[in-house]
């Protein structure tokens, strides 16, 4: 009988937001042993403090086609695998009297090229869809934006990751990295519940700490300026 030592994992993930939770689930589904560390509780950083908009990528279509394609791909994935976390509200890009109505076709063409469904609608239809819209609008384009519940999405990923063997440790503050030369072998962590310092080891350490990722990078003598 093989007894797993909880100090050792294939992957350690630092950060319990949407990104960390998604990585934990993906790794666990691939059969890797996973330890996720969060210094507070899940989704208490930027994940729990954002507007919850699920971008279609339309806003980037004309000026940044690559970002637009990435957005719509993620949008479609989340609608497929996390429908219970998503509300498909759609979004409107409106044209006002001071705008160039001809740009509407440029916008639709760019959206279509990026794989984003964009539909021109008349002002009356736009007003029916959104009664608070500026009544002076000349036209509108409907795109597949939506809203997503960030906490619910994070919790769902965490639960599925744990069901597939991941170890989720909240109240665990990473205080340093364990290094061998230029290679990170693990982390030093403070367990707030038991008031003790521990060392955990993994073949791969993922920095998913959001804005605090700069501090984690500094433990490895890396300069990643985030603020």
What residue spans do the PLM features occupy?
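Core beta-strand elements of the Rossmann-like FAD/NAD(P) dinucleotide-binding domain
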Residues: 7-9, 194-204
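N-terminal Rossmann-like FAD-binding beta1-loop-alpha1 element of flavoenzymes
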Residues: 10-35
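Short hydrophobic core segments
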Residues: 14, 200-210
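Glycine-rich FAD pyrophosphate-binding loop
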Residues: 28-48
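Dinucleotide-binding Rossmann-like beta1-alpha1 core, especially the glycine-rich loop
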Residues: 52-125, 129
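Central beta-strand plus flanking loop segment that forms part of the substrate or channel wall
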Residues: 54, 221-227
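Flavin (FAD/FMN) cofactor-binding and adjacent substrate-gating region
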Residues: 94-164, 169-170, 176-183, 188
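Flavin (primarily FAD) binding-site architecture
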Residues: 207-222
């Amino acid at each position: 009988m093989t007894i797993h030592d909880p100090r050792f994992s294939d992957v350690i993930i630092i950060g319990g937001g949407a990104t960390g939770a998604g990585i934990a689930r993906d790794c666990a589904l691939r059969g890797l042993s996973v330890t996720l560390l969060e210094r507070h509780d899940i989704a208490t950083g930027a994940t729990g403090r954002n507007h919850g908009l699920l971008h279609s990528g339309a806003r980037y279509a004309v000026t940044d086609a690559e970002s637009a394609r990435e957005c719509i791909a993620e949008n479609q994935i989340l609608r497929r695998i996390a429908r219970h976390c998503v509300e498909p509200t759609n979004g409107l890009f409106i044209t006002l009297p001071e705008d160039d109505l001809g740009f509407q076709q440029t916008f639709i063409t760019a959206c279509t090229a990026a794989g984003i469904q964009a539909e021109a609608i008349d002002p009356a239809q736009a007003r029916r869809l959104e009664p608070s819209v500026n009544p002076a609008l000349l036209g509108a384009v409907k795109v597949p934006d939506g809203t997503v519940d960030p906490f619910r999405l994070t919790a769902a990923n965490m639960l599925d990751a744990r069901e597939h063997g991941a170890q989720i440790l909240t109240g665990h503050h990473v205080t340093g990295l364990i290094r061998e030369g230029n290679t990170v072998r693990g982390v030093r962590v403070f367990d707030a519940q038991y008031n003790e310092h521990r060392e955990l080891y993994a073949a791969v350490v993922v920095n998913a700490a959001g804005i605090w990722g700069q501090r984690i990078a500094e433990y490895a003598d890396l300069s990643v300026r985030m603020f």
